Regions:
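Conserved active-site segments centered on acidic
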Residues: 1-82, 148-151
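Helix N-cap/beta->alpha junction signal
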Residues: 16, 90-91
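Phosphate-binding/catalytic loops
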Residues: 85, 91-151
């Protein structure tokens, strides 16, 4: 049975979808695709149906990250049971995850940066900072740490 990881951010057009694609790339590179399944979702409804934000897409392409035909979606309460880990990017994500999913009774909701050497850091939203390269680097670092922790 595979480990199921759900990445979460505000709109599901920058950070969480990048984490999904970066994590899947790392899993494939290590020959572990049969052991993991990653997905992504938003806490908000603002961007539902929209593709990856073009500057974030550009950053992923520049780093040779395989990307698919993504459409933003909102996380559903039922997904708490469907995933082994639910990974947020910042405090706001965690707040709204709590409102949507309810109590984290199984301890499966974590910050992505918990898996790095800066566990108290957050991954800032590049929609606002306009720093898509920094977002990519932080997400890459977090995904690498997460995969190392799980293998």
């Amino acid at each position: 049975m595979s480990i199921r990881v759900l990445f979460i951010c505000h709109g599901n057009i920058c950070r969480s979808v990048s984490a999904e694609y970066i994590f899947n790339m790392m899993v494939a590179e290590r020959g572990l695709s049969d052991r993991f399944r990653a997905d992504s979702a938003a806490t908000s409804t603002e961007e539902i149906g929209n593709p990856i934000y073009p500057p974030m897409r550009k950053a992923l392409i520049q780093h040779n990250v395989p990307i698919g035909d993504h459409r933003a979606r909102q996380v559903r309460r039922s997904e708490y049971e469907d995933f082994d880990l639910i990974i947020g990017m910042d405090e706001e994500n965690m707040y709204y995850l709590g409102r949507i999913l309810g109590e984290d009774r199984d301890g499966k909701i974590k910050y992505l940066m918990e898996y790095t050497d800066t566990p108290d850091a957050e991954i800032e939203d590049p929609w606002y900072t306009r720093n898509f390269e920094k977002a990519y680097q932080d997400i890459y670092k977090g995904c690498k740490g997460l995969l190392n922790e799980l293998t």
